[in-house]
């Protein structure tokens, strides 16, 4: 299954839950621009501009239980139960109705893995990944059994955390962490088995991931590249935010590879004229990005560069990035403003991929040969028809 551009959780899970592309639901990344400014904000559930599948079903008096779907925080009123996922920070605001909070606290429910534990030890982080899965499974089984539902959605985001920090252990089958990686998946398999057992008869089962994963070789800092190529400069060094962008800058990047041109009439200090200059600059950036290579290995780093109109269609197209970079597998794109190098690597050893997300549907007649994550909403609705 194909994910979204970019293949990140806020965009992919919102596309999954609404069945439309980002130009219709309004979420293009973990950070968004405030229109006509250089200010950045973190979008949440209140910024989703399309109806979710559970609210579509609400119109037909169908009840849903939604556990841990990213970008559903803060929890909104619905017909059923919702426990928000990443980037939820407060259990009370993550829960609807509020009456479920005492039960969640009683079972020791964990909103997310405490990834900062990597600074102490890998084993402590892994222990927390296992614990979070245990508590997530406990909550899912509780609501599966004790709530009435027509649609039930439960998400295990712990797999994402495991892959980001321990993909190298899996790839290399290292004795300790490689074994624990596989042990975790045995636990996932056990959890899925318990969920299937608790679903009851005549229920369509859909399993999916919002993106794929592969080994992370290097992180690419696109704003550094834009600076070295003369397309971007800042008034301060190091810059604290995008608002430090200097007059005359022609382009900038937000995570994970969204390039925005500094357009006259759109940005406060825009210098790129709409029309021919805009198109010429986009074409120049595409050509240069496609030539970008790892200085040491000489490997090309970019697979494709998409123009916004080729991948986004909808009423919020004017908020879309002008270009979206799709990297080669192994090269993760970053939008940091203060980095002074092209390539680097942090704690992550695994990265998201676009073209190999997973989907399984137990009702075979609902599946077509070419599937994108935005198709899942229609599949859910068809299964309930």
Feature map (PLM): residue ranges:
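Short, structured active-site-proximal loop/turn typified by the sulfatase FGly-forming signature C/S-X-P-X-R
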Residues: 1-20, 63-65
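Short, solvent-exposed loop/turn segments at the edges of secondary structure
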Residues: 9-11, 78, 221, 226, ...
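Structural motif
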Residues: 151-155, 206, 360
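Extended hydrophobic/aromatic segments used for targeting, binding, or gating
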Residues: 165-169, 173-194
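Metal-dependent active-site segment of extracytoplasmic phospho-/sulfohydrolases and closely related
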Residues: 186-226, 301-308, 316, 324-326, ...
